[in-house]
Amino acid sequence: MKLVIVESPAKAKTINKYLGDEFKVIASFGHIRDLPSKKGSVLPDKNFLMEYDISDKAGKYVDAIVKEARKAEVVYLATDPDREGESISWHVAEVIKEKNKVESDDFFKRVAFNEITKKAIMNAVANPRKLDTNLVNAQQARRALDYLVGFTLSPLLWRKLPGCKSAGRVQSVALRLICDREDEIERFKSEEYWDISLKMQNSNNDLFTAKLTHVNDQKLKKFSIINEKEAKDLTQKLKLQKFYVEKIEKKQQKRQPQPPFITSSLQQEAARKLGFSAKKTMQIAQKLYEGVDIGKETIGLITYMRTDGVTLSNDAIADIRKLIDKNYGNQYLPIKPRIYQSKVKNAQEAHEAIRPTNITYTPDSLKQKLEKDYYKLYELIWHRTIACQMENVIMDLVIANLASENKEYLAKANGSIIAFDGFYKVYRESLDDEDEEDNKMLPPLKEQEHIKTKEVIPNKHFTEPPPRYSEASLVKKLEELGIGRPSTYASILSVLQDRKYVALEKKRFIPEELGRLVTVFLVGFFKKYVEYDFTAGLENELDEIAAGKLEWKTALNNFWRGFNHNIESVNEQKITEIINYLQKALDYHLFGEDKESKVCPSCKTGQLSLKLGKFGAFLACSNYPECTFKKSIVSGNDNNEDEGDPSTILNDNKILGTDQDGVEIYLKKGPYGPYIQLGEQCGKVKPKRTPVPANLKQSEITLEIALKLLNLPLKIGIHKDSGEEIIIGYSKFGPYIKYMCKFISVPKKYDFLNLSLNDAMKLIQNNKAKLEKKYG
């Protein structure tokens, strides 16, 4: 009997049908050995000896493997074709050697395949190799590094930062990215700027829109027009001008398809198009790879899903091109196959890109046979694979340059149309921030043609801070920096959320206070080890180990020597030194720029400062013990809060920007929650204030939103039937419409700050209908 060992029962079931009766396929159910979660599992003083244990969960599977191996003439190790798969095979072989007293390595044959198809399996079995010790050592080095960081840094965190749960070699760097972005957002000061749009009409009475680009030969920049007065003055001048078409430019633009999916791009696109988390994407992809039941049989539908290679096999390309020619026509088929090269930092490119194993299994043919989410992901992979070998999209672009008759003002109008849809026929890549109009057409225009200015529209804008990371954009950033590996991204994001270091709100990552504390501590006392370049450099070293260019224990020794010295140094630091550093580093985040926000809300004379207690970090009054005010700054850690009003702590008290008169607008916190304030209090004259609606998070409040809130109640418009005003406002009961002395609540599904006149009239009509139904 020939024994074949794979990781999962699903994979075993699929492979078993391709091999004859002389083979027996069994599963290891993942890793059978690992480093136990205790001190001493990796021993630097003993040349980094690693003490592996068989887990209780894996015990029964190991017994079965050992028992079957005793009957076998040969053992085929058929785990996944990457470092982790190589490592699992090595552990299986080591356990069999130990338990069955096997001395010869010839008893084991390593078989690797990129897809679970009969052709790939039979070819792998016919061409076995030996275990690749370089790949095994690279995986052992990664595991040792992660252990050494986790099991030396985490206990130090527990002592120095009570309440913090863990630190990890890669997770801490990903957390720093999220926290650094939040710092940028908090310190960002929104600035006002304007641009001018002109609604124009050609000689055929066709309307189009242009944008003012030059005034008196000076090109307008973003901040050329910075306030309403300047915008209105310019608007009045433009209304007096007559424009004509000075020049028309026409050109073609070609758009090339994106490469086939790699792990990171699949996670990003599944997040954007399907709303899947990275974890969910990988779970479904794993099932599609290992084999799913499609009615008549169980087959592996996609190639291996942990890869950073963008190449496709020659056979796959030939099949794809054949299908394109048959289904879409020769005009969609390039003369030559497209060959892609990876742009990923540290790409290993050992495997093909992610593609269907059989391109003739179209999504439509499988729609009734796959679970809904399995179908969605397969459809995404299939379309991307087809598109990557299709012709370019061709865009016809038209640019109309307009000039005033006195040449003082220039404007520009752009139009585009898809001349040939190319790969758009089957697939378009999504973007995090899409702002693309492929079919914004201009009406027919001729050079020197005089055109009418129907309307001049000044547009007010505010600069916005960089957006928070989504799962897709964070994976992309990690990939760009060379941090982590395709197989690790999903687990990194999950761990950060499980540890309560970050929250995912509206599909964007927001750091929790606990996460910010950990990051500030690590940046202050372990800066080298959370630097992006250093972490990427370690990935390079692991690649060199895998390639046989670097001895793995040399790499571990180089890392450990400096890291252990850092640990010992921080262990000796006094807790007061750490608190003082944290206080200084978190000062802006906790209190903003307003010195008053540090005043104790209980005694009114003491100053709030950061303290560390057994339940975590908290703010306390400097007048202790006379004043015992305390407030936890970590959500869920309110054990140390016994006096004072917690809602009065000013954790978010910052300047959002200024209004058109230059008066500063603040976001503050008071006894009844957060509120917006216009200017400072002058004597007994209180500044204008307005509460922040309960459905708005403080982190979402921008200058633009604050200005809208301060302007409430606000006239939306005139009711077309009655001629009466419709007013939008906000009270302690929530947003409302005021119409003919009646107050009508605005449901949560509406964005009341941007409520349209039509929606307001619908709400008025619905309210009227309800009253008529109720009272007759």
From Swiss-Prot:
The record marks H31, R142, R143, D146, W158, R306, R499 as: Interaction with DNA. Mg(2+) binds at E7, D80. Residues 132-568 form the Topo IA-type catalytic domain. One of its GO terms (cellular component) is chromosome. InterPro entries: Topo_IA, Topo_IA_2, Topo_IA_AS, Topo_IA_cen, Topo_IA_cen_sub1, Topo_IA_cen_sub2, Topo_IA_cen_sub3, Topo_IA_core_domain. Residues 166-171 are annotated as: Interaction with DNA. It catalyses: ATP-independent breakage of single-stranded DNA, followed by passage and rejoining. Residues 1-111 form the Toprim domain. The active site is at Y304. One of its GO terms (molecular function) is DNA topoisomerase type I (single strand cut, ATP-independent) activity. Belongs to the type IA topoisomerase family. PANTHER family: DNA TOPOISOMERASE, DNA TOPOISOMERASE, TYPE IA, CORE. This is DNA topoisomerase 1. It comes from Rickettsia prowazekii (strain Madrid E).
